[in-house]
């Protein structure tokens, strides 16, 4: 039995290594646009489940961990920005506001699965327009839900966090470790 991380995210690899160094990476080929849900939190959970199950189908004897993160602000859902204009739009929407980061977690082995969602509330200070424009010209915002990396430059905008810090990076370490204990 092997442990598989169903994600190519470098941040998730780093965080999974806090739980265990013994895992392999196999990414899923799930078309995220075909999955819908009734809330942002349920969407994150549904996407994580789809990713974990897709990899588990091909690796039924292994434990597979799938994740997905979405950002929610005033009812709008933000995934990864498509381009610079999209990143600017997202960051302007988050500037000076409270938002939520939902990360779905799904652990599978064969037909057995356990899934949950972790939610963290983030309070952003207002982002100066020149800072925002300079930020979107860096590579940092483009592979992250909500167009920011809390562990990077965006830490300067973060006035407060309620909940799991690692959840904002895409892998709630404590919750994931708890779920994994049920499978190992």
Predicted regions and their residues:
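Short linear Ser/Thr-Pro motifs
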Residues: 7-9, 28, 95
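A short beta-strand-loop structural module common to alpha/beta enzyme folds
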Residues: 24-33
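Residue-level detector of short coil/turn "hinge" positions at structural boundaries
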Residues: 22-23, 142
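Short loop/helix-cap segments at secondary-structure boundaries that form the rim of catalytic
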Residues: 14-18, 35-36, 57-58
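N-terminal beta1-alpha1 ligand-phosphate binding loop
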Residues: 1-21
